[in-house]
Amino acid sequence: MQIRRIDAGLALFIGLIVLAMARYGAEAFASGPWTMADDARQFLAWGARIGNPSAMPHDLLADYWQQAAPPLYRALLYGANALGIGPVGIASLLAFPLIGASALLTWRLAGCFALDRSRKLFAAICVMAAILHNDSIFSGTPRAFASPLILMMMLGMATRRHGLTLAGLLLSSLIYPAPAITCLGIFALHLMDWRWPWTLRWRSVAMLALAGVTVVASGLFFKAGLADWGPTLLLQEARNVPSLATFDGRSSIVGRSGDVAWLCSARIGFLPAIVNCQGNGDPRLILNALLSVLPIIALWITGRRRHDQNPNAATAWPLLPYSLISSLICYSLAALVAFTFHLPARYSQPVLLVMGSLAFGLLTGGWWSRGMDRLARSRPMARMAIITIAALIGIAAFATPKMRLVRPASSDLVALIASTPHGTRVAGIDDDLAIIPARTGRTVLATPEHDIPYHRRYHRDHQALLRSSMAMGELQQPVLTAEVRRQNIDLLIFDRHFLESGVLPASYSAALPPPHRIAPSFDRIAPLRAASCRVIETPQWVAIFTSCLKRPAP
């Protein structure tokens, strides 16, 4: 009986993936009852409507974020609901199949570039480590699908399976269109016969036209659905929006100097933020370049495709420079019209994250293979020590994925709101309010987390609601009663420190232009109690039920 040998490299790779999944599972499902992904607080703000279409009436957050959810993402949420899995549940579970699919596609894609086991293993490990240290795949949002779909499209091109590439382009255009456009550019370069004279076969033209129509039509359809919330913000206008134009703003596009961070920032920077950086002068951008763009250029210059007798090498290796070229072109065009077609960074960063880390892994894998061969002959003990150190680094990288999970500071507050009737409308000033719509299905008037500035009508209306929440925090009659009735608020929630000091929490200050404080108003709670208002106080927060304010005057 023939015994099949176990591929030690594959076993190690699988072990690291399982380690990352286990760590995520522990954090997402065993660290508290209200834990969820950071960005999912936005995209699931309308989640109560999935099971009950009439839920959350006259809710600005639900109206906008329902429309902002791409078609395939909405279909996924409705499908999960039909199986009895709620929106937060499916968003939390998504990471498992997406990590598994990414790992499988990464291993196969790495094999298209290298037959040498060390280079293949290093390439696969570097790609997955980069994906796991970019929080997208854990986000539970459309962005979570970016890396596996990019890998799917690249594998299709590397193996000449154009049906796989077209399927990836279609799926990406329906759930996260920006990387699909960049990958469409890569596909166009891939189909081109670069031998002189340059030619493009009619079959390739037809295939590219089909892909182009699919991607562009899907993107325009999605953009048209958001037209009622526009027009979109212009770059010169963004400089006057606090959340964009301040370094610590929620959607910041500037560095510490105040200049637009074109090179390195999460939303407008060209380089993938494998290591967090923000600003054109941030020294960490050099590290990001070393981990992504520079390895692509190095392999492009040295022509490493000759190093392997790999049947897919001639097709696969050009994808590295094609990725850089297409990313640069698409990013530049998006930057010229920022933010008309989404964030410029979304056109370059997801693709360069995958292909740049792949190139880095191929380079380091080659160095490793040659170095280990020499040490095996001359210094076996040193070789073992280096292998041990490398293994520990790999374990540390996969044991510490960047998950960006959030938990409320006051679980008792979330539990209180969750116990109220389903139609309850909540307003106030407290950071924990950001989790309420997605986690409890109750309407919240406005929160800094949902203050997304790219569509001007939505941002204008949301800013007004944030100001209304701030005005209610003054607890000053008759303004309080008038605002409660105008906004039809059932429950007011305030950070106790805000009422005692009058100073807005930092997240609210970053979202709103000045003023950022009110007169301390904690002493005005006593008259509300005297008016038979139900008030609950804790050292962290104050809850005021407003039925006493909504009763008609005698």
Predicted regions and their residues:
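Transmembrane catalytic cores of multi-pass membrane glycosyltransferases
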Residues: 22-28, 32-39, 51-58, 64, ...
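Signature aromatic-anchored transmembrane alpha helix within multi-pass, membrane-resident enzymes
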Residues: 13, 212-213, 365-398
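Membrane-interface transmembrane helices that cradle and orient dolichyl/undecaprenyl
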Residues: 145, 150-164
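Active-site lumenal/periplasmic loops and adjacent helix-entry segments of GT-C-fold
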Residues: 10-148, 175-177, 400-404
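Hydrophobic/aromatic-rich transmembrane helices and adjacent perimembrane loops
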Residues: 340-372
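Extracytoplasmic
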Residues: 396-554
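Start-transfer (signal-anchor) and selected internal transmembrane alpha helices
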Residues: 1-26, 206-209, 554
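Transmembrane alpha-helix segments characteristic
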Residues: 307-337, 359, 388
